[in-house]
Amino acid sequence: MSVCLTEEQKRKIEENRQRALARRAERLAAQQNSQTNRSLSAPLNAQIPSGQQGVLPSAQSINATGTSRAANSKYAFQKSPSGGNTAPSVPGAAGNKVQAVGNRSHDSKSLTDPAKDVKGNYTVPEAQSVPSGPSNAPNPRHLYPAGTTPGQESAKHSNSYSRPEPLTACDNDTTGPGPLRSTTTITKFYGAGPGSKPAVPVSNKTVSEGRERGVTGSAAEAVPAKKASGATRGRCVKHAESRFRVEVGYSAELIALFKTIPSKNYDPATKMWNFGLEDYASLMSEVQQLQSVELKALEGMEGVQIAPPPATGGGTNINALLAMCNNWQRPSATLRGRCILVSRSRFEMEIGYHAEIIGLFKQMNTRNYDTKTRKWSFMLEDYQKLMESVRNIQQVEVEPLPRPVLQAFAPQFGKTTIIREEIPEVDLSQVDSKLGSNLMPFQRDGVNFAVSREGRLLLADDMGLGKTIQAICIAAYYRKEWPLLVVAPSSVRFTWAEAFQRWLPSIRPESVNVIVTGRDSQSASLINIVSFDLLGKMDKQIAATFQVIIIDESHFLKNVKTARCKAAMPLLKSAKRVMLLSGTPAMSRPAELYTQIAAVRPSFFPRFHDFGIRYCDAKQMPWGWDYSGSSNLNELKLLLEESIMIRRLKSEVLSQLPAKQRKMVVVAPEGITAKTKAALAAAAKEMAKGFKSKVQEKEALLLFYNRTAEAKIRSVLEYIMDLLESGREKFLVFAHHKLVLDHICEELGKKDVPYIRIDGNTSSADRQSLCHKFQMSEKSCVAVLSITAANMGLTLSSADLVVFAELFWNPGVLIQAEDRVHRIGQTSSVNIHYLVAKGTADDYLWPMIQEKIKVLGQAGLSEANFSETTESTDYFYKDPKQKTIYDLFQRSFSEEGAETNADEALLLEACEEADLGDAVCSPTDYSGNSCKRRKIDEYFAL
């Protein structure tokens, strides 16, 4: 039964046939080149079989584009009886006829046998005469003079072979037989690989020099490919301000190239691609390497020097390697394999048994066979040689290394080195001295890496290793290119503002613009901080001006279909410097990592499907493709670390870290409702008044404290959810009010996040079982704890993060709570986050806590020092009203004596009652309750 082929299959078959013919002719040409060189010193007499002879045309009969100049010559191509193109016998460069004979009956083996080269099948014509392109080249086996029948031509040359006139020195650079050349005239005729030099019809000297460069295969530069006679032609035209478009016919090869350009944009209305002018040189450089496409330069840019693509260090041209990524599939192959990068210097070839393949492996000098895995590995310097040899085995298909791997490790393919080159030290003299002097050694390494990658990187350090300070330093290094845009979760926007004011004192506070609403985004400052949700509402013209962008918690962009990702990706691809910060780069879920890679290096994987096939173990299901898996993760890790990612774990830099790292997190004020703001304002106003008794003062403080708890609930929940989304699996959350604890547990329950809760109602037996459950849990788990009920007697060292949703006026209680994780058995540095809300009681509690800790430290009673280990401390700014309230806090909680202790105990008892759910009492409730007051007096009288 006949098999119906689709048009696509027919097209591929025809392409494969044309390529096979081109390779065959190239091998013939290489042999004939050696034979021609011999003819310079010795006559050659050979008997030629009759009936299948032909002559290649001279340079003068073919123009630069490969078309016949029939109008200017009596020689013209004719059709042979067998259907092939025929060509005349024409005068050679020295005035004599240059003839070439091809035997149609020779098999491929005999054509490539060097021992038969002396028989001679071709005499090579002048270099400048040759057009390129296998699909449109005349067949050298069917070439006849115009007006001559095949029979006549056969009779004419049936008994002898006319020896050509010796070539001049400028026509050939070497004599005698020798090894196969990397570039020959027939190679140019049929279109060599991407590294070939074009044949330019100029003086003999120029042609000779061009040939010499092609033969030696210089690694210093990549030479443009000779265009085929049927090449697709187009032009570059100015499109808009700082952009140009390409007007050209359809070319699959060109479309694939377009998709790798960072500034690409496709207009479906005109069906044309346009690009930023900054990518003009790189695009034209790549087009030069395509044989099938020719583009006219952009008007006014004709004189721009188009730098050739870089070559690898040992003579291997990167374009030759990249060319192997095209058309490697062989539908008829019986054995399939693939290449996988296993280290910076070696790759494996995974393939089944095949005698010829094993024979090739044993020819490689750097081969290594692992008897356990039964796999062969080789140094990268053998990659090109091995792949070229494997391609000659028709029954075998081997998937090459991906293009990004070839680009990232390009120097290794020329000369492999196991030791990574040391990244040069960056000059930070232009950065604020306060910032540069506070960088730890590993943080300085991160800055060096970023600058070596031209400010485009994924900073994936573990949590608590100072990604914020590194990002600020990198951005400050590129300060001349500001304005700067910082995109962060809404819960940490003001934390970023505080960090800029602390580490860059040269920046005026009014230069930092925190975008809170959509209306705030209509103007840009020097530093602009916006949430992911508000990014899409920014004015597009303003957003386009940002050339330096920081994305905090960049894993928020993992889903390409979300609005936040759609708003961010165009900005990131067009920006000059992009810093993505993420403590959890999702290496086990490569599909979630794709958008971050595309943001930093758009040219790596223009199509997600290609990435998914290689690294997501993509499978085609009845409903579509499934990209949820993972594959080749080690190769992906090596690729990212070599190109865009730097990641350090706490265990690697633990010796440089303090035991505790405190961080003040300023939560967003918009989380406070208008009603709560009014209540806070009323409470603050009440506190600013004078009070007749200290009890009334304490009661006013208690009311203000409770209002603060209500105001912070929304922001606290948002911060906890951000931590969970960031991949934090186990941490502690301390709060004081029952209202706050209830809301946290309720939200965790809605999200199906496992948690434990320990407060004043939890029995001693239950406490121990809950602690054991938390310690042994291997999955995510959050411990929701009361500050006063769970600040001692518990061990929760399996976590290394503590979050204080509320502050407490007694710093000793806070330090005890911190030590629930900072205990024996803790092997990591502990991170402590204090959530502080402006416009609340935190304005006065936070500086008061720091001052108390400082006094204790000076007295030698405390090792903890908030001011030295907290990332942001310059938070409290006093005005007359704030000063009054602050003095009230200080006076209420710092006086000595039994009366003060009684008042503090009264406040603590009231807070504990609030923790159990009692309503907030009015200012007269406690002062009028003589029984309760007597009970407390009796307690202190004991």
Swiss-Prot record:
Q: One GO biological process from the UniProt record?
A: regulation of transcription by RNA polymerase II
Q: Which residues form a coiled coil?
A: 5-29
SMART domains xrefs? DEXDc, HELICc
- For ATP, which residues are the binding ones? D461, D462, M463, G464, L465, G466, K467, T468
Q: Where is this motif: Nuclear localization signal?
A: 647-664
Query: Which ranges carry the Helicase ATP-binding domain?
Result: 448-603
Region annotated Disordered, chain positions: 24-214
Looking up Pfam families in the UniProt record yields:
HARP (PF07443), Helicase_C (PF00271), SNF2-rel_dom (PF00176)
Identify the keywords attached in UniProt to this record, alphabetized. Answer: Coiled coil, Hydrolase, Nucleus, Repeat
Looking at the record, the residues that make up the HARP domain are: 228-299, 331-402
What segments bear the compositional bias annotation Basic and acidic residues? 104-119
Question: What are the Polar residues biased-composition ranges?
Answer: 34-71, 79-88, 129-138, 149-162, 171-187
Show where the Helicase C-terminal domain sits.
Answer: 719-872
Q: What is its EC number?
A: 3.6.4.-
Highest taxon above the source species:
Eukaryota
Predominantly, its location class is: nucleus
> What's in the GO CC field?
nucleus
A GO molecular function annotation here is: hydrolase activity
The short motif DESH box is annotated over 552-555
Q: Provide the protein's localization.
A: Nucleus
Show the PANTHER family listed in the entry.
DNA ANNEALING HELICASE AND ENDONUCLEASE ZRANB3 FAMILY MEMBER, SWI_SNF-RELATED MATRIX-ASSOCIATED ACTIN-DEPENDENT REGULATOR OF CHROMATIN SUBFAMILY A-LIKE PROTEIN 1
**UniProt record similarity statement:** Belongs to the SNF2/RAD54 helicase family. SMARCAL1 subfamily.
UniProt protein name? SWI/SNF-related matrix-associated actin-dependent regulator of chromatin subfamily A-like protein 1
